[in-house]
Amino acid sequence: MAYRDQPLGELALSIPRASALFRQYDMDYCCGGKQTLARAATRHDVDIDIIEAQLAQLAEQPIEKDWRAVPLADIIDHIVVRYHDRHREQLPELILQATKVERVHADKPNVPRGLTKYLTALHEELSSHMMKEEQILFPMIKQGMGRQATGPISVMESEHDEAGELVDVIKHVTQNVTPPPEACTTWKAMYNGINEMIDDLMEHISLENNVLFPRALAGE
């Protein structure tokens, strides 16, 4: 099956582990989920035939859960527990680790300078963002007022883009979250945590941008 003309967001939802494959190629399937596979492959200099073959292989596996068929209230409850609560745990710990690494290894050329600042900015951005969703947008959607939520949803999508930009900066200062040979245990653990946080955040944003918000605006 040809996947090149399909949006990344749709492919991430319909093919098991496609999201992990897109992350491997540094393709943005959450905020950039409307771009086609062909366009993303061109932008990242990826052979379209190779990635299509990889997706075809993944598509043979059963999908764990098709969120496109799950009631909106259940999706919201899942987002809060699986992603919002998790981000609230992840980021403070990562900030502590980054503070230590930047202080202890200040003289190392590969130290991720500014990482603490950017993680703190992401934490503040997401804390405000998630609170607005939980207090304003999610109750509207649960009450069947999704059609009237155009304004709040537009703001949330814009804030998703801002979070994505901060993630790009974090990836830049960490050499794409790759620890150097001299990295200590804390440094390596922090990078593992950052990679996990980025995976979670991309899944989180994709579920909202590509499933929850469109269905809410359609009046479900």
UniProtKB/Swiss-Prot annotation:
Localization terms from the record: Cytoplasm
Keywords for this entry? Cytoplasm, Iron, Metal-binding, Stress response
Recorded GO cellular component terms are: cytoplasm
Task: Name the Gene3D superfamilies on file.
Answer: nmb1532 protein domain like
List, alphabetically, the InterPro entries matched.
FeS-repair_YftE, Hemerythrin-like, RIC_family
**What are the disulfide bonds?**
none
* Major localization class: cytoplasm
Quaternary data: Homodimer.
The UniProt entry's sequence similarity note says: Belongs to the RIC family. YtfE subfamily.
Q: What does this protein do?
A: Di-iron-containing protein involved in the repair of iron-sulfur clusters damaged by oxidative and nitrosative stress conditions.
Q: What is this protein called?
A: Iron-sulfur cluster repair protein YtfE
Say which species the protein is native to. Answer: Salmonella choleraesuis (strain SC-B67)
